């Protein structure tokens, strides 16, 4: 299969939404029956985002095969059916590490290692390898044109486009067209300068996607086309919308997909966007509203919980409920009390690392249990629910995780030293293992117990969900907690690790060690989140048993 490439770059400012624009194009092309994949090239020197602060970089998205990747890959999976893998995201750090490893091994036979050709060739090789077996590969380069970090990537995609030829490669550039209220018009000069910068490194964009708070007037589109060397029909307006799921329809109405198919000589049927139309309809026509409290410590940057936020929205669509997320800093609960949780229809405690704010999360789990408020715990959210139950119901005073208190009398959560992965291999870790890339990562099989809420929600005896953790329930103390009434409803493939717990004495109290948010999509939702939001709706209407 011959793969055609669309390289996506951004200019003027960062955070314009390259990932959303690229994913929207991918969604339309997929709706035309084409097999599409996506890639994100990140210019930073970290090998992967696994050890980066969520408040700096946003969430780390975990793929099925266990790669810790950029949050844009989450957008890709929510917009198209293709599952991302380790090959769909790589960083400058990863490329340099691989090249230096080869140099040490002697693979270059004594050559002087340089950015050109060695680094650029390594980037090109990875792009080609990551796109095999698809009709179209959309390759997004992180950062902004002009950044020094992205130059090797820009040079690599320039070379690749030359080698592939015009019939197999094209460039889409996303830029900002600001509206100046004082002048009463949009300004095209930043876009012209951005394209000029791109031309200076040998790249002529074929499509310009113009971000603005309004549609670009026809005269301004003509001006952009004239001064940026693109056809007028290739100047696409991407105005601000109240839902990112409206963007595929917005850009399709301007013929973005036709530009691609014409360029590559692809004869494909018209895009069927009926699934996206259904999503937009559900979003615009809710029958009720719920407020869900998200108790975390990275709340100053909502992107730190991007997939959880989106999964809650998807669950709202499935239940025809408008979901409002109220972020609650777990440290504030420690200082101001659980009164901060009053008036919520449900409580969600997401994943996290480190002891800052952990007692606030434990108190949130206690509040939900005692007040019969729907509770969903994810990763650390499951562990704090277990710790709270052990302390306050099972009589294990001072129970904790060894992540936060190595001297606790009741270490109900401890480091996983050994587990069996999806392929049957035994993975081992110790306290001295590196932080980066050493967690239990990726999709794992989980057995669900009969007669549990988890089994009822999923409607299946076995499921596959993605993990990202290095601490687990301590099996030595597990019987004591179960005897006190907590139900273990999900177990790992070898039935040795606890994957899900629930409280049978509570109307809806479910927690999972895995991250269900990574597999939720706007078209399909996710059973765990759908059940959680449904319970929140019942609670808000007073239908919950107290």
From Swiss-Prot:
Annotated catalysed reactions: UTP + L-glutamine + ATP + H2O = CTP + L-glutamate + ADP + phosphate + 2 H(+); L-glutamine + H2O = L-glutamate + NH4(+); UTP + NH4(+) + ATP = CTP + ADP + phosphate + 2 H(+)
Keywords in alphabetical order: ATP-binding, Glutamine amidotransferase, Ligase, Magnesium, Metal-binding, Nucleotide-binding, Pyrimidine biosynthesis
Listed binding positions for UTP are 14, 187-192, 223
EC number in record: 6.3.4.2
GO terms for CC? cytosol
Region annotation (Amidoligase domain) ranges: 1-266
Source organism superkingdom: Bacteria
Binding of CTP, residues: 14, 147-149, 187-192, 223
Major enzyme class: ligase
Q: Where is the Glutamine amidotransferase type-1 domain?
A: 291-542
Instruction: Enumerate the residues binding ATP.
Output: 15-20, 72, 239-241
List, from the UniProt record, the residues annotated as the active site of this protein.
Answer: 379, 515, 517
Q: What controls how active this protein is?
A: Allosterically activated by GTP, when glutamine is the substrate; GTP has no effect on the reaction when ammonia is the substrate. The allosteric effector GTP functions by stabilizing the protein conformation that binds the tetrahedral intermediate(s) formed during glutamine hydrolysis. Inhibited by the product CTP, via allosteric rather than competitive inhibition.
Query: Per UniProt, where does L-glutamine bind?
Result: 352, 380-383, 403, 470
Q: Which PROSITE patterns match?
A: GATASE_TYPE_1
Task: Give the UniProt record's GO annotations in the biological process aspect.
Answer: 'de novo' CTP biosynthetic process; pyrimidine nucleobase biosynthetic process
Binding-site residues, Mg(2+): 72, 140
Q: In which pathway does it act?
A: Pyrimidine metabolism; CTP biosynthesis via de novo pathway; CTP from UDP: step 2/2
Any one GO molecular function term: ATP binding
Q: Which family is this sequence assigned to? A: Belongs to the CTP synthase family.
Protein function = Catalyzes the ATP-dependent amination of UTP to CTP with either L-glutamine or ammonia as the source of nitrogen. Regulates intracellular CTP levels through interactions with the four ribonucleotide triphosphates.
Protein name as it appears in the record: CTP synthase
């Amino acid at each position: 299969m011959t793969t055609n490439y669309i390289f996506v770059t951004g200019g003027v400012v960062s955070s314009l939404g390259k990932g959303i624009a690229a994913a929207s194009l991918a969604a339309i092309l997929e709706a035309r029956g084409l097999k599409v994949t996506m890639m994100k090239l990140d210019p930073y020197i970290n090998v992967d985002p696994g050890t980066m602060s969520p408040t700096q970089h946003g969430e780390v998205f975990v793929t099925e095969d266990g790669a810790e990747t950029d949050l844009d890959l989450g957008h890709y999976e929510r917009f198209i059916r293709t599952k991302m893998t380790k090959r769909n995201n790589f960083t400058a750090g990863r490329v340099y590490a691989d090249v230096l490893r080869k140099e040490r091994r002697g693979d270059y036979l004594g050559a002087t290692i340089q950015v050109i050709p060695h680094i650029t060739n390594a980037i090109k090789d990875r792009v080609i390898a990551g796109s095999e077996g698809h009709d179209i590969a959309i390759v997004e380069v992180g950062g902004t044109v002009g950044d020094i970090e992205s130059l090797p990537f820009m040079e690599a995609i320039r070379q690749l486009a030359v080698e592939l030829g015009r019939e197999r490669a094209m460039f889409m550039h996303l830029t900002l067209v600001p509206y100046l209220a004082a002048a009463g018009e949009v300004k095209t000069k930043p876009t012209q300068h951005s394209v000029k910068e791109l031309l200076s490194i040998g790249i002529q964009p074929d499509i310009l996607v113009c971000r603005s708070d309004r549609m670009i007037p026809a005269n301004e589109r003509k001006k952009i086309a004239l001064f940026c060397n693109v056809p007028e029909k290739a100047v696409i307006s991407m105005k601000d919308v109240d839902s990112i799921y409206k963007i595929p329809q917005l850009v399709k109405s301007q013929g973005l997909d036709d530009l691609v198919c014409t360029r590559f000589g692809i004869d494909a049927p018209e895009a069927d966007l009926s699934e996206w139309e259904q999503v937009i309809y559900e979003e615009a026509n809710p029958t009720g509203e719920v407020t869900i409290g998200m108790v975390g410590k990275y709340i100053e940057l909502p992107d730190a919980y991007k997939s959880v936020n989106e999964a809650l929205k998807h669950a709202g669509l499935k239940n025809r409920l408008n979901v409002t997320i109220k972020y609650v800093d777990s440290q504030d609960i420690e200082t101001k009390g659980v009164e901060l949780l009053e008036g919520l229809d449900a409580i969600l405690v997401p994943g996290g690392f480190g002891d800052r704010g952990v007692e606030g999360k434990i108190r949130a789990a206690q509040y939900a249990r005692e007040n019969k408020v729907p509770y969903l715990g994810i990763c650390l959210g499951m562990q704090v629910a277990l710790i709270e139950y052990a302390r306050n119901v099972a009589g294990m005073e001072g129970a904790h995780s060894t992540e936060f208190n190595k001297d606790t009398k009741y270490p109900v959560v401890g480091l996983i030293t050994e587990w069996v992965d999806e392929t049957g291999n035994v993975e081992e870790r110790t306290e001295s293992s590196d932080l980066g890339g050493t967690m239990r990562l990726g999709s794992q099989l989980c057995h669900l117990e009969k007669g549990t809420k988890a089994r009822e929600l999923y409607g299946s005896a076995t499921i596959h969900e993605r993990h990202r953790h290095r601490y687990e329930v301590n099996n030595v103390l597990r019987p004591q907690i179960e005897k006190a009434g907590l139900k273990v409803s999900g177990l790992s493939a070898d039935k040795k690790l606890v994957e899900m717990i629930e409280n049978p004495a509570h109307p809806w109290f479910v927690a999972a060690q895995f991250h269900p948010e990574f597999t939720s999509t706007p078209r399909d939702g996710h059973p765990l989140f759908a059940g959680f939001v449904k319970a929140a709706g019942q609670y808000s209407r007073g239908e919950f048993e107290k």
